[in-house]
From Swiss-Prot:
Species: Methanococcus vannielii (strain ATCC 35089 / DSM 1224 / JCM 13029 / OCM 148 / SB)
Main function: IGPS catalyzes the conversion of PRFAR and glutamine to IGP, AICAR and glutamate. The HisF subunit catalyzes the cyclization activity that produces IGP and AICAR from PRFAR using the ammonia provided by the HisH subunit.
Substrates-to-products reaction catalysed: 5-[(5-phospho-1-deoxy-D-ribulos-1-ylimino)methylamino]-1-(5-phospho-beta-D-ribosyl)imidazole-4-carboxamide + L-glutamine = D-erythro-1-(imidazol-4-yl)glycerol 3-phosphate + 5-amino-1-(5-phospho-beta-D-ribosyl)imidazole-4-carboxamide + L-glutamate + H(+)
Active site: D11, D130
Entry GO MF terms: imidazoleglycerol-phosphate synthase activity; lyase activity
Record-given protein name: Imidazole glycerol phosphate synthase subunit HisF
Domain of life: Archaea
Pfam families: His_biosynth
Transmembrane segments: none
Entry keyword annotation includes Cytoplasm: yes
Self-association and partners: Heterodimer of HisH and HisF.
Length: 272
């Protein structure tokens, strides 16, 4: 088993870190550079910065936040939000990012994945996939053709890809999309369950496992982390390569080192 990664996620709005529930009700969680330094000291393997308003409000990313962080933190930094062109990739990589995460722009223009991976290398291209369970009312629905159907106690459903910060459904099946981005040259998938986001009830194991098993790419599980036990579960049962978390770290409910020790106790390899 490859070494698993623990990755704090910093959702950034107007230069501050914020956190919400199910992509809504945002509250302030601190300064991105200061938080990055803390997580670096705690032993985080990487950091993810998501400018959560950039795609929707068509705003450029706060390049200076990336620059200031990259000057003080020396673990890999992934940056996403509002990135639409190869030139956007170039600017943010130049500012000090190691990888670029694209979501809305990848759905709107899948060729961007191919283009960016050819220019900067697949290791630089992370495709973020925001997913919501879409429950089926009529099993004869003609739009279900080619979609992967799952069952839960609440009924049958499929996993739908959302864009614009979770504001717009696409009608695209998440498993089909994951396979497509792999073929186009993505180096990694950042997979967020919108249903689990901010709930602290645990990752969506069904979703994570389904995506992890359908591609050879590393999958970062995101959405719902409320404890070290949830991280252990997503590694053991969801086959995730990395676990992303926000609230439990930002509000000091635990720290990276404690999570890693718990993971290690369960015979899962991590960098201590």
């Amino acid at each position: 088993m490859l070494t698993k990664r623990i990755i704090p996620c910093l959702d950034i709005k107007e230069g501050r870190v914020v956190k919400g529930t199910n992509f809504l009700e945002l509250r302030d969680a601190g300064d991105p550079v200061e938080l990055s330094k803390i997580y670096n000291e705690q032993g985080a393997d990487e950091l993810v910065f998501l400018d959560i308003t950039a795609s929707f409000e068509k705003r450029d990313i706060i390049i200076d936040v990336v620059k200031r962080t990259a000057e003080q933190v020396f673990i890999p930094l992934t940056v996403g939000g509002g990135i639409k062109t190869v030139e956007d990739f170039r600017r943010i990589l130049r500012a000090g990012a190691d990888k670029i995460s694209i979501n809305t722009s990848a759905v709107k223009n899948p060729e961007l994945i191919k283009e960016a991976s050819e220019i900067f290398g697949t290791q630089c291209v992370v495709v973020a996939i925001d997913v919501k369970r879409n429950y089926i009312n009529d099993s004869n629905d003609k739009n279900l053709s080619g979609k992967y159907i799952f069952e839960s106690k609440n009924g049958k459903f499929w996993f739908e890809v959302y864009i614009y910060g979770g504001r717009e459904g696409t009608g695209i099946d998440a498993i089909n999309w994951a396979k497509k981005v792999e073929n186009l040259g993505a180096g990694e998938i950042l997979l967020t369950s919108m249903d689990a986001d901010g709930t602290k009830d645990g990752y969506d194991i069904t979703l994570t496992k389904a995506i992890s098993e359908s591609v050879k790419l590393p999958v970062i599980a995101s959405g719902g982390c409320g404890s070290s036990a949830h991280v252990v579960e997503v590694f053991k049962n969801g086959n995730a390569d990395a676990a992303l978390m926000a609230s439990i770290l930002h509000y000091r409910e635990t720290d990276v080192q404690k999570i890693k020790k718990e993971v290690q106790k369960n015979n899962i390899p991590v960098r201590i």
